[in-house]
């Protein structure tokens, strides 16, 4: 098992890519704290995982990631209960597609608060524990739109571009302390959000992917597993694209 007895925290872990990451980490022997936005979604995800993987060591929490005090308290509790924090997966985020003419400052702030500041708060919560043990891994979820933009919802690609910069800067600062920081930039992935897209809209998008299909959450999760494992012990400051060579 690649992550045996590692203590991992996964935000946005109740569905989609985050849920797949939690599941993959559990199968590799990690103990996982699953963060979700609401208690019912966290508890439902934990129940589903334990039903599928009876030996799974997984717990759910639901702090508001925009609230630095709630995040600090949550990470202090995790560290105190488990003795350490080995892996942080910053996956929580929000996407939207409002045309620029209808954009408001409040909407822009909402996207940035969760996608960027929430990630910052979580890293601040985890890093002190990692520094104490002289090692740790932080993995951030970016997106292919951080490289190419998108025609609406301007705050989302801006936020993911910021994620890339945060990843590279934090990697440089924390490398001497034994903490690796990387990001994964998924392309078009088959999540609940994508399944709601009409087929006539999705088909042209698929046609732009050289591999000829959309990706699966489990494929992104395996990238997280690799980057969290000792197999990636000399990799830091990388934004790994998992997009089938899609280019918007």
Tell where the protein language model's regions lie, with residue ranges.
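Active-site helix of classical SDR
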Residues: 123, 159, 167
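Substrate-binding pocket helix/loop in short-chain dehydrogenase/reductase
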Residues: 99-100, 107-109, 194, 201, ...
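C-terminal substrate-recognition "lid" of short-chain dehydrogenase/reductases
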Residues: 2, 120, 135, 213-242, ...
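Short, small/polar-rich loop/turn modules that mediate ligand/substrate recognition or access, typified
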Residues: 89, 175, 180, 235-237
């Amino acid at each position: 098992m690649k992550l045996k007895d590692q203590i991992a925290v996964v935000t946005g872990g109740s569905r989609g890519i985050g849920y797949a990451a939690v599941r993959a980490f559990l199968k590799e022997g990690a103990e996982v704290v699953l963060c979700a936005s609401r208690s019912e979604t966290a508890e439902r995800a934990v129940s589903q995982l334990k039903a599928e993987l009876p030996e799974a060591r997984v717990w759910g929490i639901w702090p508001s990631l925009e609230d630095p005090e709630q995040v600090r308290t949550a990470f202090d509790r995790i560290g105190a209960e488990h003795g350490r924090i080995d892996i942080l997966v910053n996956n929580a985020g929000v996407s939207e597609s409002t045309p620029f003419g209808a954009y408001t400052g409040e909407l822009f702030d909402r996207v940035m608060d969760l996608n960027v500041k929430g990630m910052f708060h979580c890293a601040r919560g985890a890093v002190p524990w990692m520094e104490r043990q002289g090692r740790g891994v932080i993995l951030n979820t970016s997106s292919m739109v951080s490289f190419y933009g998108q025609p609406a919802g301007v705050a989302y690609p801006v936020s993911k571009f910021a994620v890339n910069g945060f990843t590279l800067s934090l990697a440089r600062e924390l490398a001497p302390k034994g903490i690796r920081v990387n990001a994964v930039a998924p392309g078009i992935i088959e999540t609940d959000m994508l399944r709601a897209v009409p087929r006539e809209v999705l088909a042209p998008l698929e046609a732009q992917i050289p591999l000829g299909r959309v990706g699966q959450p489990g494929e992104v999760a395996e990238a997280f597993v690799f980057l969290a494992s000792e197999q990636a012990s000399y990799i830091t400051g990388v934004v790994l694209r998992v997009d089938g060579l899609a280019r918007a």
